[in-house]
Every structure is written in C-alpha cells, then in structure tokens.
Amino acid sequence: MNYFPWLTIIVFLPISAGSLLFFLPHKGNKLIKWYTICICILELLLTTYAFCYHFRLDDPLIQLAEDYKWINFFDFYWRLGIDGLSIGPILLTGFITTLATLAAWPVTRDSRLFHFLMLAMYSGQIGSFSSRDLLLFFIMWEFELIPVYLLLSMWGGKKRLYSATKFILYTAGGSVFLLIGVLGLGLYGSNEPTLNFETLANQSYPVALEIIFYIGFLIAFAVKSPIIPLHTWLPDTHGEAHYSTCMLLAGILLKMGAYGLVRINMELLPHAHSIFSPWLIIVGTMQIIYAASTSLGQRNLKKRIAYSSVSHMGFIIIGIGSITDTGLNGAILQIISHGFIGAALFFLAGTSYDRMRLVYLDEMGGMAVSIPKIFTMFSILSMASLALPGMSGFVAELIVFFGIITSQKYFLMPKILITFVMAIGMILTPIYSLSMSRQMFYGYKLFNAPSSYFFDSGPRELFVSISIFLPVIGIGIYPDFVLSLSGEKVETILYNYFYR
C-alpha cells in the first residue's frame, strides 16, 4: 500500500494554488495566465508521475487508496482511489484543462476570477473521478457546478445568462435525484450509513427498490451526459459560452455523466441495469439519429457541433447497455476519443469566430484562402468526428458495433435492426460534418467583417490544435493504449452480471 497522499494533493493543488491568483497584481494579465498554465502543467505532470509509478494495469482493485475519517457524527470518510475506469478520464481532464487554459489566452476581463474558476472546476472534476465514497462523489459533483455556472454566466455571448440559468436548473434538478439515490443506497438495510463503493458493490437490494434507485441515478446522469430528452440545455450553453469553457464542457463535463452511469448504475445496481439495458440501447440509437439529423438543420456553428456531441454520446450509451466487455470497452474508448475531438472542434470554431465575428454558417464562406492553417486543422478533426479510419472515433464506434453484435442478451433480429439504425446515424454524421466545412471554408461569400481580422492561426493556436490531434491519431492507430487501462476493471464489473 502506498501511504503518500497522491490523490489528495492532486485534488487540492489546482484550487489551493488558484486561490493565490487573487494576490497577484491587478493588471498583470500575462502573469495570471502564465501562472495558471504552470499550475495546470504541474498538476498534469504530478498526475502522470503518480499513475506511471504507482498504478498497475493487471490489478482491477482500487489503487492509490486513501481513507481518512472526516466527520465522526455521520461516519463520513475522505475516500479516494483510482482503478482502470477512472484513470483515463482523470488524465483526459488534466490534458484538456491545460489546453483550455492556453486557449483562454485572449480573455482579459476579470482574468483572475476566470482562471481561478477554471482551476476550481479542475479540482471538482478530479475529485468526482477519484471518489470512493458515495457522499464525497455527490459533494464533488455539486461543487463542480458552481464554477461552471459562473464561467457560463459571466463570459460568452449575449444570451449567456439565459443559457447559464437553463444549465443550472437542469443540473440542479438532476442533483435532487442524485441526492435521493445516494441517501437511499447509504441508509438501506443498516443502522449506520454505508457509503463506501466497495461495500455497496457487494450489497443486494429488493428488485423494486433497486429499480427506484436506478431511475434516480439515471435521471441525474442523463442530464449531464446528456441523454435525450434531457439534452436541451447543451446546445444553448455551447452556443453562448466562451470557447475555452466549451472545451471543458464537451471534453470533460459530459463524460462525467457517462462515468457515473458505469460507476454507479452499472457497478452498484447490476440487476436493475440488466432490466434497463435494452431501453438504454433503444434511447442511444434514437439519440444518434435524432441529434445527427437535428445538427444538419442548425445555422449556428457551435450549436451544430453541440448536437454532434449529443449524437456521439449515443454510442457511449449503447456500449454501456450492451453488457459485454467489448461494448463497455468501446464506450470507455469513445469517452476518451470524443473528449479530444469535441474539445478540438469547439476550439477551432472559437478561433474562427475571433477572426470573423460570425456565428451563422449561412453568413460564412471562402475562409480556406484567408486562414489555411485553421482550415486544415478543422478539416482533419472533422474527419476524426465522422469516424475516419485511422482516427480514434472510428475504432471506438467499431468496437461498440462489435459489442452490440456479440451481446448474448439480445436476439438476432433486434441486433440487426439496432446495427442498421446505428449505421444510418453514421451516414448522417459525414453529411452534417462535411456540410459544415463546406459552408465555412468553400465558396465566394463576401464578408461583412473587416479584413483586418483575417490573420491565420498563430503558434499558440497551432500548438493547441496539434496537441489535441496527436492523441486522436495515436489512439486511432494504437487503441490498446487506452483499452489496456480499463480491460481488467471492465471484466470485474461484468463478472457481477453472470456470477453475482
């Protein structure tokens, strides 16, 4: 056992170091930005070091475990730990947050508060992914909403307050169900509350009660993922938020919902999950088709990308519902893959907006000549989004396909029907994706914006784009890098479905 509190340091470093931002000179914008980037890089290096030297791939149990008594009255513990399921999202969080901080370089208004909120959000997300106590998971889940709401309401478009209010209403509503589920699981069948994930994973419940718990958690995670019809906050939020915030939302926030589905609904409530899994697959299939076809009708560039995110989350839901190791591994790979691709597309959409100050696709056109570097990167990452072979999206979606086909739970005809509908969704993806590129970069449209805005991508923007592109191509060529992290844990989770 490792006694050094690696995870506690990793959770507290961003927010505690970020609080020092308020003691920096008021007009030292450049100093504030460099300080924040250095904190993010230090955090990422510390996380990578701890995982490289103390995480063993062949061990499905909790590693780097920390267990401290916190509040005696509630028998509440500060429990942290990682396994194959959480290591990928934690590393993704560090990587995307570091690049989002670099992407936020143009932000000058209330710079100290902006960067502090990004670091506070970073701490909340790492805390959620590494929690081993149900109440601690809930606290981190809620804590992370505060900086997100402030980032949405204070920086962004003209309707940012409306979109931030919509976001907080949806997520707060979902949190009520999450709290009910947490208290129900913790207080069931014992005199003392039991909130430890390991203890709860071995506990059984009456079927009706387990279904009630499952529905409560499902609603909470469906808002965050998002799963239709609880997705309507997402396009508005992405349409109005600053693009660095969009990177964090698309890259990490949506993945927290999918992570919760696997960590709690699937791992702690396996009987209810096996009952609901056919419905998850049906909803996921509908989501792929609905969001892809809705995306095609969006005039707003960022809303079109937002609907593409909803469509891609459908594959994750199908992978989780397949109850096979192939399908679940595909879902985890899609979580990581779409984290990179979604963040990259929002970043490039934001840098394009910085130059031309246009958000509607029908007002754009002919940008390829003016900004060839952005055009090249946007085209490549659009190809990654439509699952071009050799990119991470292709491997993830293919593995989810295999997962649903090889599932023993479903009959042949439903599997053929679901696969056929998923294939239609994959055909719709290139239609809206290539249409978006055509409207932005091709044609001879005359702009109403001054020509002085049309300078191409600088070194900072190129660095961010290439840094996100490299993992996308790397995972596409060698997906086993991600799959090897989660393989043992996935087998352990699925063991419950057949031998519990």
UniProtKB/Swiss-Prot annotation:
Membrane topology (UniProt):
Multi-pass membrane protein
Give any Pfam family that matches. Answer: Proton_antipo_M
Signal peptide interval: none
Q: Does the keyword Oxidoreductase apply?
A: no
Q: Which InterPro entries match?
A: NADH_Q_OxRdtase_chain4, NADH_Q_OxRdtase_chainM/4, NADH_UbQ_OxRdtase, ND/Mrp_TM
Question: Could you give a single Gene Ontology term from the biological process aspect?
Answer: ATP synthesis coupled electron transport
* Catalytic function, reaction form: a plastoquinone + NADH + (n+1) H(+)(in) = a plastoquinol + NAD(+) + n H(+)(out); a plastoquinone + NADPH + (n+1) H(+)(in) = a plastoquinol + NADP(+) + n H(+)(out)
Give TM regions: 4-24, 31-51, 87-107, 113-130, 134-154, 167-187, 208-228, 242-262, 272-292, 305-325, 330-350, 386-406, 416-436, 462-482
The Enzyme Commission number assigned here is: 7.1.1.-
Output the superkingdom of the source species: Eukaryota
Q: Where in the cell is it found?
A: Plastid, Chloroplast thylakoid membrane
Q: Name one GO molecular function term.
A: NADH dehydrogenase (ubiquinone) activity
User: Could you tell me the keywords of this UniProt record?
Assistant: Chloroplast, Membrane, NAD, NADP, Plastid, Plastoquinone, Quinone, Thylakoid, Translocase, Transmembrane, Transmembrane helix
User: What is a single cellular component term in the Gene Ontology annotation?
Assistant: chloroplast thylakoid membrane
Family from the record: Belongs to the complex I subunit 4 family.
HAMAP family per record? NDH1_NuoM
Against NCBIfam families, the record matches this protein to:
NDH_I_M (TIGR01972)
Q: What protein does this entry describe?
A: NAD(P)H-quinone oxidoreductase chain 4, chloroplastic
